[in-house]
Amino acid sequence: MEYQPVIAVNDRHIIGVESLVRWHDSKFGRVSPEVFIAIAEKLHLYPKLSYFIAEHSVTEMAPILQRYPTFALGINIDTYEIQDQKYLPYLFELVQCYNINPDQIKIEITERISLPLTELSDFSQRAKSFGFNVVLDDFGTGVANLVWLTELDFDFIKVDRIFVNALNYDVKRKMVGPIMELLTSLNRPVIFEGVETQREHDIIKQNCHWGYIQGWYFYRSMPKPELDQLLAKQALTPGIHNGPQTPNLAQLKVI
């Protein structure tokens, strides 16, 4: 497993991480998750992989989550986890075993999942009933963006790299502005994915200083020991954050 930090725009503190499954083969080197996850699905091994990811992520991150009650761990899910009635109870029992607050776990639902909206809505409500936070991931890549925003019960929005990249171009940036106004009006914390350049960072900071950033501009994903060193080096104090920041509509600037 590797973990990519999520950064608060206003003070550059690391407020959480996203758990990312990785495989480094001795012969073939680094294998793309798209490749080995597809193989696991074909071999009917994905259920084991799913539970391995949950258990390994929570177990590795437990010391940090226990020490910092506002630090968050994001776990990606797919169709299997949504349809598996045992997944959420298992995850809840897991965090209970480590004395972790359920709201420190962010379950990330991507718009690429092709399931009926009613099924997604039911899962979202069940996840929140266990105390987990729900993240609408990859916003802007699906075909039902607006419907998801109005029908699903979620706590965070993750803006996809495709929108972040548009900030580099004046013409495209004018189209992104109204979308950002919409997201802000929902009064939900926004995480910008795939931030890779100084320009992208500066525009986000100027217009959405209450938001969060995840991307190579700050950090790539890293193994747990490297993350430990990073947090120690930066003298991380996530306790200064009283939960996620939500936008102040009066301070909104149109990009």
Give the ranges of each region predicted by the language model:
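Catalytic-core regions built around general acid/base machinery
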Residues: 90-97, 122-130, 174, 178
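Active-site core of bacterial EAL-family cyclic-dinucleotide phosphodiesterase domains
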Residues: 1-39, 192, 219-222, 251-255
